[in-house]
A protein has these predicted regions:
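Bacterial N-terminal signal peptides
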Residues: 8-17
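Exposed, flexible binding/inhibitory loops of compact, secreted disulfide-stabilized domains
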Residues: 20-160
Length: 160
């Protein structure tokens, strides 16, 4: 019995340690978001996640060229208009792809904000709805102007 208690305590400590970096990043993103300046962005419309992309877990993507973008997304012009144009010379993409689900799920971009010390926060909201008779891959993607400096930028994702 004593050994079981020790194993459980060690397991709990291990889980706490593994979650610390996630919680630290979440806390940092919230603090940066509060002090940051809004950045204009364009929500990408009429795209879909390709069916050969692994959608078993959440993916946070930063894409700066068309070839990489096309590895993840396809154009869905038949779904109500032309896909949003991206100027790859001036813009990059921040995308969030959630795991495949059988629930109606929408992801809405809330804001993109930046700080003086090269941090960018992409905040979004997730709305889950009713159960579906099929599966879907919820995602959102926004185009943001590339920074004028070539300095490394740290990007945080923050669910609101």
């Amino acid at each position: 019995m004593k050994h079981l208690a020790i194993v459980i305590a060690l397991g709990a400590l291990l889980m706490l340690c593994c979650n610390c970096s996630f919680m630290d990043k979440m806390y940092a993103a919230q603090k940066i978001d509060q002090a940051a300046t809004p950045v204009p962005f364009t929500t990408l419309e009429n795209y879909f996640v390709r069916n050969d992309v692994d959608c078993s877990k959440q993916q946070r993507l930063i894409i700066d060229n068309k070839a990489d973008f096309e590895r993840f997304f396809g154009m869905a012009a038949h779904m109500g208009g032309m896909p949003t144009e991206v100027n790859w010379n001036k813009q990059f993409i921040i995308a969030l792809v959630m795991p495949e689900t059988n629930r109606a799920t929408s992801i809405y971009p809330v804001a993109v904000k930046t700080t003086d010390n090269n941090c960018l926060v992409f905040s979004y909201q997730v709305k889950k709805g009713d159960k579906l008779s099929h599966t879907m891959v919820p995602f959102t993607a926004v185009a943001v102007n590339k920074p004028e400096t070539r300095q490394e930028m740290q990007i945080f994702f923050l669910e609101k």
